[in-house]
Amino acid sequence: MRSFASDNNSGVHPLVMEALNRANRDHAVGYGDDVWTEEAVRKIREAFTPDCEPLFVFNGTGSNAVALQLCTRPYNSVICAETAHIYVDECGAPARMTGCQIRPVATPDGKLTPELVRPYLCHFGEQHHSQPGAFYISQCTELGTVYRPDEIRALTELAHRHGMYVHMDGARVANACAALNLSFRQSTVDCGIDILSFGGTKNGLMLGESVIIFNPALKKEACFVRKQSAQLASKLRYLSCQFTAYLTDDLWLKNASHANRMAQLLYAGLKELPGVRFMQKVESNQLFLTMPRPVIDNLLKDYFFYFWNEEENEIRFVTSFDTTEQDIEELLRAIRRYCH
């Protein structure tokens, strides 16, 4: 039975597996000096901008840590939503590796706004205080909501006026682009993002991310920071070749659009049920909702999913590129049975 706990629980797309098998047929130079990585870099530059610098890394936490090290110095602070992955779910790795203070901002929907962050833009030049160095935003957010381009531009313009950078955690950026009908470039480069953690494991890849640097000022030390952060793979082609498959014939878009559609199908079946209340707009492939506790307890006997706020009986469902309509129908059938 399929899990609705996380898109990390999904499998690997067959076309990505084919790419891995092709990369495995012969020897190749290590550490990224291979034809597979060369092609992946070309595809990323084609999708984003010709002058970006992609660095392939092992995972999301490593990607965020590398990106934030490039954006900051140890006396800086990183401003993020209180639900941010770097603040809640990365065991303090970004704080430890950057030396920075992570400053969480209370938000109703997981999004930063200029109004919310302005109180944190203070004490510039005062030696007793951490100096604001970067905004960290997630696209999609940890609450499944999606930033519109104008919302991102408002943050990047504010940051740049204060000599700061903006790092986007794009673990689910494909779902956001699919939801908004935008290209990767329109959602990042054109909005003024300085550096992106470009993920794919939630959308059909096996492992790995790419730190994509857009701001030229951040490129010079990038390869050294990646190596020192233990994020340089010797057989790097097994990370990079997946991105070639991902960016060929819009595989990323097909996968993300499907996951989003499955979330909307689940939402349509749940919204009218007694005792069900949605806590956030369903804009991507994540659903946050409350149900009566007996319904949740019974459902947990058959399905794997997470509590988001156990005191409030709030749970999270996540759909994936390989979620089927039958999976949704079976889940809805079980919920209806327990709701009545």
Residue ranges and their predicted role:
Residues 2-290, 294-302, 308-323, 327, ...:
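Conserved PLP-enzyme active-site core in the AAT-like
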